[in-house]
UniProtKB/Swiss-Prot annotation:
Family: Belongs to the GPN-loop GTPase family.
Name used for this protein in its record: GPN-loop GTPase 2
Purpose of the protein: Small GTPase required for proper localization of RNA polymerase II and III (RNAPII and RNAPIII). May act at an RNAP assembly step prior to nuclear import.
UniProt-listed PANTHER family: GPN-LOOP GTPASE 2, XPA-BINDING PROTEIN 1-RELATED
Keyword Transcription recorded: no
CDD domains, alphabetized: GPN2
Residues the record marks as site: Stabilizes the phosphate intermediate: N78
Keywords: Acetylation, GTP-binding, Hydrolase, Nucleotide-binding
Keyword 4Fe-4S: no
SUPFAM superfamilies from the UniProt entry: P-loop containing nucleoside triphosphate hydrolases (SSF52540)
The species this protein was found in: Rattus norvegicus
Binding site for GTP: G19, S20, G21, K22, T23, T24, S178, K179, M180, D181
Modified residues (N-acetylalanine): A2
Length: 310
């Protein structure tokens, strides 16, 4: 029937550690999508989120409150949040009843920031799996603060966390380096930006760590971690400045390709636009180079000097 609501829905599960910019991303992405003409519903799955800057279509706080759980069960913030997710998992009928009237919208799920929820705890994964049974196609959008690139040890840690998340969540996955406009506020990058976004030869990071007296004692451990990351060869990043429309568009292009939205029937596209969405997301070098020129200070001389020191 022409007036029937579409059976398949699409959306993004926005995940990442605390402070990575998930809520700000949901606000910026929702505004961008509405400007494109998409009907958007933002769903807050974080019971600790207060003072939300966006219009919330569904709020898990209506089902269970973190403060109430902490008081009643004498749990801390982390334990209370895990309980809230387990409670939501046990009451998915409530969530489905809230989402069903929004069928035909594009969903943005603002998820909690506790890392363990995406690396080894099962509740969030089970919730996403159940959504797939409701014919809701999600892409996991994993945000990581870009300033971690300025510290080789932290960047290796980020790579391990990103890999563990990709393997555990079991969704089409897009990793983002958020807050690109602030990337060098904590220090200069040792290499060009594409080294970090494409996760190139990580042995160079090991050489940088070896120059640090503290990390030199853990070289074998770091070598094994790097080997694990390179053996899987799954992790890469897209740089994002949520204030930059071109940057948001590149992210959306990758997300649409990952969950199949660009090939759906909800949004009419010309053949040229379809091919652009299908192929263009695979080639990030030119866009990454543009972002580097925009947000990073010229460092050719510094790079040469550091290369001489290796």
């Amino acid at each position: 029937m022409a007036g029937a609501a579409p059976t398949t829905a699409f959306g993004q599960a926005v995940i990442g550690p605390p402070g990575s910019g998930k809520t700000t991303y949901c606000l910026g992405m929702s505004e961008f999508l509405r400007a494109l003409g998409r009907r958007v519903a933002v769903v807050n799955l974080d019971p600790a989120n207060e003072g939300l800057p966006y219009e919330c279509a569904v709020d898990v706080g209506e089902l269970v409150g973190l403060g109430d759980v902490m008081d009643a069960l004498r749990l801390g913030p982390n334990g209370g949040l895990l309980y809230c997710m387990e409670y939501l998992e046990a009451n998915l009928d409530w969530l489905r009843a809230k989402l069903e009237p929004l069928r035909g919208h594009y969903f943005l799920f603002d998820c909690p920031g506790q890392v363990e929820l995406c690396t080894h705890h099962t509740s969030l994964r089970s919730i996403f799996s159940q959504m797939a049974q409701w014919d809701l196609r999600l892409t996991a959008v994993h945000l990581v603060d870009s300033h971690y690139c300025t510290d080789p040890a932290k960047f290796i840690s980020v790579l391990c966390t990103s890999l563990a998340t990709m393997l555990h969540v079991e969704l089409p996955h897009v990793n983002l380096l958020s807050k690109m406009d602030l990337i060098e506020h904590y220090g200069k990058l040792a290499f060009n930006l594409d080294y970090y976004t494409e996760v190139l030869d990580l042995s160079y990071l090991l050489d940088h760590l070896a120059s640090d007296p503290f990390f030199s004692h853990y070289r074998q451990l770091n070598e094994k971690l790097v080997q694990l990351i390179e053996d899987y060869s799954l992790v890469s990043f897209i740089p994002l400045n949520i204030q930059d429309k071109d940057s948001i568009q590149r992210v959306l292009q990758a997300v649409d390709k990952a969950n199949g939205y660009c090939f759906g029937v909800q949004e009419q596209r010309s053949l040229e636009a379809l091919m652009s969405a299908a192929v263009g997301a695979d080639f990030h070098f030119s866009s990454t180079l543009g972002i580097q020129e925009k947000y990073l200070a010229s460092s050719d001389q510094t790079a040469e000097q550091e290369a001489m020191q290796l």
